[in-house]
């Protein structure tokens, strides 16, 4: 097998429904003749969403008791808050939000922005503790 077809080293992330420490360290990159792919999880119990944030909008400042989230910015730069850290993540950047961490996504741009979200742990939309919310929910 040529070097372009070999998979990069990977450490198993979780066993069963455990929440990983930081899965961004274990994203698998594989090059192929047609291009490449990134593998974020393998055979794990997860919930996967693509979140679209409209220009000038942001999600509530929130935390979760039962899940951690891995975010992958898909297109336009997205404002990120995780804990006390705030920054603008570029397309392709991976962000780990540990269980219990205060976090938020926002779109400072002029076009909709998308983020792939992979939630590890027990997923339930009721497991959202909103600390601030622009929409009074």
Each model region followed by its residue ranges:
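Double-stranded beta-helix
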Residues: 17-31, 104-137
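A generic "binding-loop/recognition-motif" signal
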Residues: 55-57, 66-67, 85, 101-102, ...
